[in-house]
Amino acid sequence: MLNVFTLSNGRLVQVEIDQLSDLEQLQPIWVDMESPTREEKRWVKQHYGLSIPEDATGEDIEESARFYEEDNGEQHIRSDFLIDDEDESRSVRVAFILNQRNTELKSCGVLFSIRDEDIPVFRLLRMRARRVPGLIDDAKDV
């Protein structure tokens, strides 16, 4: 699922994406990919020039893989989020990619998150940012 968020009057607004051309008219601050399909990954690569590593949410999380910076200015961060289900607690890995410096790329100023399942804290952030104007000003605030 490809969730794209823009800012409108200081509030986070979700925009539905059904095809690649939908991305052309947007200036998002956050592109959240929950279990993205190959097609959705292709759209992101084609429009933003962003290559999503195949192991973005993989199990191997050596210290060097948790944070690194690409030559083009993209910062890659992998972090685990705790899910506390009724039966058990577990962690879910999320990969983040942020480019704040390279203005030559369409990805500049956009936070990309890649995850395999829904994470409650992401829902909570979206709800708060929709209701509270000015809570989020840019991709770094997400």
Task: Give a label for each model feature.
Residues 1-142:
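Peripheral, non-transmembrane regulatory/ligand-interaction domains of membrane transport proteins
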